[in-house]
Regions:
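ATP-dependent helicase/translocase motor core
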Residues: 2-339, 348, 352-363, 395, ...
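Loop/turn-to-beta-strand initiation segments
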Residues: 147, 338-339, 386-389, 410-413, ...
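Signature of the SF2 helicase/ATPase Hel1-core->accessory helical subdomain module
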Residues: 157-161, 169, 200-201, 208-212, ...
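Structural recognition of the conserved hydrophobic beta-strand(s) that form the central parallel beta-sheet
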Residues: 189-190, 390-393, 476-482
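AAA+/P-loop NTPase substrate/partner-engagement loops
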Residues: 344-351, 383
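Conserved helicase motor
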Residues: 347, 369-378, 394-399
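Conserved motor-coupling elements within RecA-like helicase/translocase cores
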Residues: 373-390, 406
Length: 493
C-alpha cells in the first residue's frame, strides 16, 4: 500500500466525515484555556433544551454562556466527565444536559431528535496547549468537548505504535486541563498500519497502554497477537470503520465506559487509599457483547450461547455489559426479556457487577442482589416482580423452581459465570425449571432421556420434570461464560 505523509490521517478523517457521522472542524472557536468549544456546546443546548436555555438566560442574562461553562466545569471536577455526559448538571434548579443518547425504542420522536442533534466533530492537528503549538493528529469531540485522541504512526516512515506511546507519555503534559483524568479526553489511541494500543489516563512515564487489537485471526477466533490482514484497506481500519462510528462510540459512552474504584487500607497507617480507573472496553469485549446482543435482537429469546472468555481478559466487565444490554434490549419497541439473571459462585463478581451496572443506571431497583443475607423467597419475588437484573448464586436457585409464578410468555436471560462449574450437578438441573415455559410437549425430550438418565441419579418423577427443562425453550436464553469449556459443557451448548 502506497501511503504518503499525512495520507493515513486524511483517509481516517475522510471516512469519519463521509460515513461516521462527524463534521470537519477547524478549531476556530476552541478555547485552549477552558479545553472546550463553548459555541458548539451552546448550539447543542439551544437545539435540544430551548426552554431550559431561555430560563438560564433569564437568570444570568448576557453572562449565561460563562455561567454554563463555570457550572459545567465545577460539575466535571466533582463527578468526572463521564458522569456529566450521562446525567448533565443542575444550576439554580435548571437541569442542563451536555449530550443525548440513543433511545431503546422509536416511540418518542423528541428523544430521537435530541440524539440526532449531538454535534460530533473531527479535527486534524488539534492544538491543545496553552504553552506551545503542539498538536494531536486527530481529535474527536462531542458537542465541543474533546473526548477521543488519536496519535498516528506509519511504518513506511520508520515509526510505529511505540513512537505514539512515547509521544503520549513524554510530550503530552497530564497537567494540561484537556489531559486531566476524566475531565476531557476519555480515551487515547496509538495507531499504526498494523496495531492499536489505548489508555484512558496519561500518567507520564507511568502511562499504561492496553492492546486494542482483534487477534491475528480476527475477533472471536483462536489466534495470536496482532490483527488479520485487511485486503480492502488498512489493517487497523476497524477502529474508525466500527468503533468510532457515531452510534458505536455513543453506545460505548452510555453503556460500556465505567469508573472502577479500588479501595486499599494502608496496614501501617490504617488510612484508606482510593484510586479510580476509567474502563474502556477492549476490542474483544466490545465484539462479543455486540454480537450477542445483535443475535438476540434478530432471533429473539430461546437460544443458548457459550462464550470462551479467558481469565484475566475482563470477563467480569463483559458479563456486566451484557447484562445491562440484555436488560434494556427491545425488538419492534417491545422489551425482549422480563429479567436478566446472573448466576455466579463468586462474591467478588457480585460486587463488581453491581458497581459497574450502577455506574450506568442510577435508577433504584434496577439491580437486585440475592446474597447470603437473603432467602430464596427474595429471589422468587425479584423474578416475579420483574427486577431488570438479578444477581444470585446457584445454591439459591433449586428451592424456588416449583413455587415460581407461571412464566408463560415471559422471557428470561440467564448469564452463567464459569459455565462448567455452575452448569453441572443437581442445582443446575433445577435452574431451567424455575424459569422455563413448561407448556411445551414432553415428547420432544423423549429422545434425550437415555443420555440424561446416566447423568441423573434422582427419582424417575424428578427426572421427567428435569428432562422437560432440557433443550429448546422459546422463553429462556442461556449465556455461559467460561475460560475452559469441558466436554459436557460443549455438548450442552
Amino acid at each position: 500500500m502506497n501511503i504518503k505523509e499525512k495520507q493515513f490521517e486524511s483517509d481516517i478523517e475522510q471516512y469519519l466525515i463521509k460515513y461516521g457521522g462527524y463534521t470537519k472542524d477547524d478549531q476556530s472557536n476552541y478555547d485552549r484555556d477552558k479545553a472546550i468549544d463553548m459555541t458548539k456546546l451552546i448550539e447543542y443546548i439551544q437545539k435540544t433544551q430551548s426552554k431550559e436555555w431561555k430560563r438560564y438566560q433569564r437568570v444570568y442574562g448576557s453572562d449565561a454562556q460563562n455561567k454554563i461553562y463555570k457550572r459545567f466545569n465545577e460539575s466535571v471536577e466533582m463527578h468526572g466527565l463521564l458522569y456529566i455526559l450521562r446525567n448533565g448538571f443542575d444550576d439554580r434548579g435548571i437541569r442542563i444536559k451536555v449530550a443525548s443518547f440513543k433511545p431503546e425504542t422509536t416511540l418518542n420522536q423528541e428523544v430521537i431528535d435530541k440524539y440526532n442533534a449531538n454535534i460530533l466533530t473531527c479535527t486534524r492537528q488539534f492544538k491543545y496547549s496553552t504553552e506551545n503549538e503542539n498538536s494531536i493528529d486527530i481529535v474527536l469531540s462531542l458537542n465541543g468537548i474533546p473526548i477521543v485522541a488519536l496519535e498516528l504512526k506509519n511504518q513506511l516512515t520508520g515509526q510505529d505504535v511505540n513512537n505514539a506511546k512515547k509521544q503520549f507519555m513524554y510530550d503530552r503534559n497530564p497537567r494540561e486541563l484537556c489531559f486531566n483524568f476524566n475531565k476531557r479526553f476519555l480515551v487515547y489511541f496509538c495507531v499504526d498500519l498494523y496495531e492499536i494500543y489505548m489508555t484512558t489516563e496519561l500518567r507520564g512515564k507511568d502511562t499504561f497502554f492496553l492492546p486494542f487489537n482483534q487477534g491475528s485471526n480476527g475477533a472471536g477466533n483462536v489466534g495470536g497477537a496482532g490483527n488479520p490482514e485487511n485486503k480492502d484497506g488498512y489493517t487497523t481500519s476497524y477502529l474508525w470503520e466500527k468503533v468510532l462510528q457515531k452510534d458505536v462510540l455513543m453506545d460505548i459512552l452510555q453503556r460500556y465506559m465505567t469508573v472502577a474504584i479500588d479501595e486499599k487500607i494502608n496496614k501501617k497507617t490504617g488510612k484508606k487509599k482510593i484510586s479510580k480507573k476509567l474502563i474502556f472496553p477492549r476490542y474483544h469485549q466490545l465484539d462479543v457483547v455486540t454480537k450477542l446482543i445483535e443475535d438476540v435482537k434478530t432471533n429473539g429469546s430461546g437460544k443458548n450461547y457459550l462464550i470462551q472468555h479467558s481469565a484475566g481478559s475482563g470477563k467480569s466487565n463483559s458479563i456486566a455489559w451484557l447484562a445491562y444490554g440484555l436488560a434494556n434490549l427491545h425488538k419492534n419497541n417491545e422489551k425482549i426479556f422480563k429479567s436478566v439473571v446472573v448466576v455466579t459462585d463468586r462474591t467478588v463478581l457480585d460486587s463488581q457487577l453491581q458497581d459497574t451496572i450502577y455506574g450506568f443506571d442510577h435508577t433504584d431497583g434496577v439491580v437486585e442482589k440475592i446474597d447470603g443475607k437473603k432467602t430464596s423467597k427474595d429471589l422468587r419475588d425479584a423474578i416475579n416482580n420483574g427486577k431488570k437484573i438479578i444477581i444470585t448464586t446457584l445454591q439459591k436457585f433449586p428451592y424456588i423452581y416449583d413455587e415460581i409464578d407461571d412464566n408463560t410468555n415471559k422471557n428470561f436471560a440467564i448469564i452463567v459465570d464459569e459455565a462448567h462449574s455452575s452448569q453441572s450437578g443437581n442445582n443446575a438441573k433445577k435452574l431451567k425449571p424455575a424459569l422455563a415455559d413448561t407448556t411445551d410437549s414432553l415428547k420432544e425430550f423423549a429422545e434425550i432421556e437415555g443420555k440424561e438418565e446416566s447423568e441423573i441419579k434422582d427419582s424417575e418423577d424428578i427426572l421427567v420434570q428435569e428432562l422437560l427443562t432440557q433443550g429448546y425453550h422459546k422463553n429462556l436464553s442461556f449465556f455461559a461464560f467460561t475460560a475452559t469449556p469441558k466436554e459436557k459443557t460443549l455438548e450442552m451448548f
